[in-house]
Amino acid sequence: MRILGLDPGSRITGVGIIEGERLIHAEGLVLGSGPLPARLGQIFERLQVIIETHKPTIAAVETVFMSRNAQSAIKLGQARGAAICAAVAAGLEIHEYAPRAIKQALVGRGGAAKEQVQHMVRILLKVDRDLGEDASDALAVALCHHHIAQTNRRLPPGVTLR
């Protein structure tokens, strides 16, 4: 199972692709500071190219966290929409995970610090270089889905974690 992890953002969108616990691709799509509709178009178009190149079979996306700034939350929701549309247009099944669930799956604590999650991503994928915050976050989402899918395969029929 090749998993596309997405950490959408209106300035930088994190992208990570894994197969099992093997790193296939990781990058932060820097979208610049142009008008929001142009940046949303970039997310869609650049993800289409990445999906076509690396052929993931499933997409895992971080859900929106509540922000005190309504405008930021709206922009984040729009970036998520562009990313999800690119994945759906490519025929990928979408799975969504809350930030606390991702931290729980990787670190064992839903309240883990971002640095702890990034450290676990590097350990699990056996990577000794800095992947960048956005790519690392996307890989964390992909690893979360991988771990949950593995666990669900071991459970009796009809029983799942989610």
Indicate where each model-derived feature is located:
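Phosphate- and other anionic-substrate recognition elements at nucleic-acid/protein interfaces
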Residues: 1-162
